């Protein structure tokens, strides 16, 4: 018996695998696959087929049936009406045909959705319908059908065993079954509107086919690409294969332009780059702008600078019109891909309201205002409706919700809305909408790019993907972070090794010695880097500067603008002309390295109008620098010193104190990881041109999980005069974020002049600052029933009320026990609320704390100018109020 040689078998197999497949239909039929086709009221294309479109044009499970302007689809032997097909996002809105009528007449069963084809959209959920239930029992959200008996609907299966059967239905996530008796009309209405699913068929093979002028199709479940041969005119098809991993990485690393925007990449995309962006972020470049449509709402890119924090979008329909016709209120899913910045708020607009003028005028707060649209009364609310700041106005909000026909929520800039609150008018409202809102970086993409990959999207899993040379990864390419951090050190070691090896007389000695030295050097470096590795991951989105660049931007450190306990601050200028502050840390022993990591890792996680913005950092050996935004007005202590020529009134000081409180509230509650500052004082509060405060200097900060109410510290940190008592003696309680609250209270007292009283009345040499609250409480006791008296002392009643409020808030904040102090979100509420709502806090048991000699490891400083000299007018205000 003879056998075919192995080489022939291999050749035969390859020819069989790659030989073009004959197309089953004619060239004319192939034309139907190329064009979109109309089915009912829908226009569809690949991967659908049906009607005049042949079966090989689409996936075998996606046949559309067209009858009397109705489009339907059969899934697992169940018919679904197709209300809408979005070819751009590959989404369908479906409804079970049997659920379009009476619910009790529907087929009570659950069709199986092929997971390789369909995925339920995240704005919908599945609810379980339990039927043939025990009529003797009581069920939540129940109803009795005439022929099927009692049924109940629930998201849980608490009482499934008492019902004989069950099936599932898809409803919007906002749908909540009634607690007791089911409102059948409510349920039927939700089911008739249908639900959305996303096709998870891989689009990349078809995109590759289209780019080569081929036509996409299917041979069973295998995607194929078909072309008309030039010689015979016949149709040939070949299986489509996805581009290589390195090819995808190369393509997605290339940036693109759209309209007036340049250098765009993930999550945005344009035709031909579908695998390089999120499906919801397809850009339309036709109008001279870069616009995207998410959930039927158009957004325009105003600025998309990946190298800075300036990434702004705005709703297109509100750019030139406060009252656009029929604005949509579908909440966009932007935050699933790009998070809003911390200072973004949801501006809520109410249209066509049938309210009596007495119901809303005058408004109870600056959070509310009138739009002034021509058709009906219209109003706006400048805060997210779920904000605790609006808890006192729920009655007004309920009136607006019930009496207004339309409500629209629009993301907007928090600072712009603050301006609107201060000066409410249509121009400021228009500016707030036209300014747009800021977005944060996509953290997954930042990690991917740093690791050498390119950002993309997996259509099958509907998840982010990082394209790497060796294949796609979930988040980042497989690299050793030690190699990135220490490559300069490695290069130096290798250079020294090579240089020494050239000395012939020491070759034998070096062969024996260098391996040991190399192991020792690498082990020391690795140990040091391992301690920094976790926190360095937080630095990925930041700009890394070399020491030469730092020296160049500061003109060789020419202008000093500030000095601190850990370094000197210089004025600098970036290449784009922006002024920056460059803090160069001292090359000192002790906690210098940890101070640098604390400051950079803490600031890199923040984005808030009252937190100084970190722009980059430098770390070369022992040389470390931090680059952040420059604020011309400098620090707060310059404005509350008696040496200053600029006198701030109480209204300005109140605005600064409120801004600092909001910044601390953000650090404690607004970040993914809670940040405790531990060094709140006037020197660390910077002021911009509008005297808006920004908390700075995070050298002593500590990160902890929000669920942690107690922190473990091995050292004392802070500045004398602002340190919470529990930081020095644990007899007062445990260290927590409430330590910042105490420091804030001391800051408030210094701002309004209360600290000056201590300066005059205290002559002891021990320097303790624990005595100063006692005279405040003594003066409070002199007042009738603990109330503060209204005394005319040459200031306005508004300023007097501000001083009273700040004094009471300060007293609450400096309670000796941390548990008696309010959290910062409560402090903000107290500062924004009315004076009448504030009570005089109970007098704590105050003890003098003697600050003994400090250990070398303690991070505690005593600024010679930290206890500011405050002008006499503010001192007089506080003394009179408390007398």
From Swiss-Prot:
Protein name: LEAF RUST 10 DISEASE-RESISTANCE LOCUS RECEPTOR-LIKE PROTEIN KINASE-like 2.7
Catalytic activity: L-seryl-[protein] + ATP = O-phospho-L-seryl-[protein] + ADP + H(+); L-threonyl-[protein] + ATP = O-phospho-L-threonyl-[protein] + ADP + H(+)
Cytoplasmic side: 513-883
Principal place of residence: membrane
Catalytic site: 679 (proton acceptor)
Localization terms from the record: Membrane
Modified residues (Phosphotyrosine): 628
Organism: Arabidopsis thaliana
Bilayer-crossing regions: 492-512
Extracellular side: 27-491
Alphabetized UniProt keyword annotations: ATP-binding, Glycoprotein, Kinase, Membrane, Nucleotide-binding, Phosphoprotein, Receptor, Serine/threonine-protein kinase, Signal, Transferase, Transmembrane, Transmembrane helix
Positions annotated with a glycan in the UniProt record: 41, 69, 74, 183, 219, 227, 303, 356, 384, 444, 460
GO MF, any single term: protein serine kinase activity
């Amino acid at each position: 018996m003879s056998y075919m040689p192995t080489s022939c078998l291999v050749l035969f197999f390859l020819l069989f695998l790659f030989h073009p497949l004959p197309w089953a239909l004619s060239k004319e039929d192939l034309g139907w696959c190329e064009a979109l086709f109309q089915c009912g009221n829908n226009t569809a294309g690949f991967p659908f087929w049906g009607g005049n479109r042949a079966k090989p044009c689409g996936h075998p499970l996606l046949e559309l049936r067209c009858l009397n302007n109705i489009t339907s689809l059969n899934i697992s032997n169940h018919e679904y009406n197709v209300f809408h097909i979005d070819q751009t996002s590959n989404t369908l809105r479906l409804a079970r045909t049997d659920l379009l009528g009476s619910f009790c007449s529907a087929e009570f069963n659950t069709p199986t959705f092929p997971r390789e084809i369909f995925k339920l959209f995240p704005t919908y959920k599945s609810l379980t319908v339990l039927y043939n239930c025990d009529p003797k029992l009581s069920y939540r959200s129940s109803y009795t059908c005439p022929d099927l008996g009692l049924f109940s609907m629930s998201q849980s299966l608490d009482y499934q065993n008492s019902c004989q059967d069950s099936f599932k239905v898809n409803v919007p996530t906002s749908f909540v079954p009634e607690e007791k008796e089911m409102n059948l009309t409510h349920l039927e209405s939700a089911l008739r509107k249908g639900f959305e699913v996303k096709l998870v068929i891989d689009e990349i093979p078809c995109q590759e086919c289209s780019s080569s002028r081929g036509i996409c199709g299917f041979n069973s479940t295998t995607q194929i690409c078909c072309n008309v041969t030039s010689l015979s005119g016949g149709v040939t098809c070949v299986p489509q294969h996805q581009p290589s991993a390195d090819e995808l990485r190369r393509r997605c690393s290339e940036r693109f332009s759209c309209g007036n925007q340049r250098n765009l990449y993930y999550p945005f995309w344009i035709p031909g780059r579908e695998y390089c962006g999120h499906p919801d972020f397809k850009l339309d470049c036709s109008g001279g702008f870069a616009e995207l449509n998410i959930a039927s709402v158009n957004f325009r890119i105003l600025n998309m600078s990946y190298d800075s924090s300036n990434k702004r979008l705005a709703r297109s329909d509100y750019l030139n019109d406060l009252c656009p016709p029929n604005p949509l209120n579908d909440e966009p899913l932007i935050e699933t891909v790009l998070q809003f910045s911390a200072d973004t708020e949801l501006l809520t607009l109410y249209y066509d309201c049938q309210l009596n003028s007495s119901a809303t005028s005058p408004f109870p707060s600056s959070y509310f205002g009138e739009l002034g649209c021509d058709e009906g009364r219209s109003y706006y609310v400048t805060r997210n409706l779920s904000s605790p700041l609006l808890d006192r106005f729920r009655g007004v909000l309920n009136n607006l919700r019930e009496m207004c026909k339309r409500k629209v929520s629009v993301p907007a800039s928090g600072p712009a809305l603050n301006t609107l609150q201060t000066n409410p008018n249509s121009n400021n409202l228009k500016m707030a909408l036209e300014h747009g809102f800021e977005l944060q970086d996509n953290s997954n993409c930042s990690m991917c790019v740093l690791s050498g990959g390119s950002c993309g999207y997996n259509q099958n899993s509907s998840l982010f993907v990082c394209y790497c040379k060796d294949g796609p990864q979930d988040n980042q390419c497989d690299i050793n972070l030690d190699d990135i951090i220490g490559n300069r050190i490695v290069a130096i070691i290798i250079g020294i090794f090579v240089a020494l090896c050239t000395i012939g007389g020491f070759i034998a000695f070096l062969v024996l010695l260098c391996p040991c030295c190399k192991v020792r050097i690498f082990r020391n470096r690795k140990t040091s880097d391992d301690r920094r590795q976790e926190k360095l991951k937080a630095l990925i989105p930041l700009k890394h500067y070399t020491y030469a660049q730092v020296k160049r931007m500061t003109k060789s450190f020419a202008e000093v603008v500030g000095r601190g306990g850990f370094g000197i601050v210089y004025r600098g200028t970036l290449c784009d002309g922006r002024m920056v502050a460059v803090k160069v840390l001292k090359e000192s022993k002790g906690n210098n390295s940890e101070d640098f990591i604390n400051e950079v890792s803490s600031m890199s996680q923040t984005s808030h109008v009252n937190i100084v913005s970190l722009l980059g950092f430098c770390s070369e050996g022992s040389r470390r620098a931090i680059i952040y935004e420059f604020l011309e007005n400098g620090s707060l202590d310059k404005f509350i010193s008696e040496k200053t020529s600029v006198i701030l009134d109480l209204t300005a000081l109140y605005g600064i104190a409120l801004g600092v409180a909001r910044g601390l509230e953000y650090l404690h509650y607004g970040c993914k990881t809670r940040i405790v500052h531990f060094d709140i004082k006037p020197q660390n509060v910077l002021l911009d041109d509008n005297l808006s405060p920004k908390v700075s200097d995070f050298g002593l900060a500590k990160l902890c999980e929000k669920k942690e109410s107690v922190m473990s510290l091995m050292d004392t940190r802070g500045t004398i005069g602002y340190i919470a008592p529990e930081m020095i003696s644990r007899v007062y309680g445990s260290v927590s974020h409430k330590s910042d609250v105490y420091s804030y209270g001391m800051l408030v007292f210094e701002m309004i002049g209360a600290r000056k009283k201590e300066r005059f009345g205290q002559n002891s040499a021990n320097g303790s600052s624990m005595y100063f609250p006692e005279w405040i409480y003594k003066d409070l006791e002199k007042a009738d029933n603990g109330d503060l008296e209204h005394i005319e002392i040459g200031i306005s009643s508004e300023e007097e009320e501000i001083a009273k409020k700040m004094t009471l808030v300060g007293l609450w904040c400096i309670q000796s026990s941390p548990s008696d102090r309010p959290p910062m979100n409560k402090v903000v509420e107290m500062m924004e609320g009315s004076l009448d709502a504030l009570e005089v806090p109970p007098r704590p048991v105050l003890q003098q704390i003697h600050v003994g000699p400090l250990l070398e490891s303690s991070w505690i400083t005593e600024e010679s100018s930290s206890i500011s000299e405050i002008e006499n007018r503010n001192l007089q205000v506080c003394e009179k109020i408390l007398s």
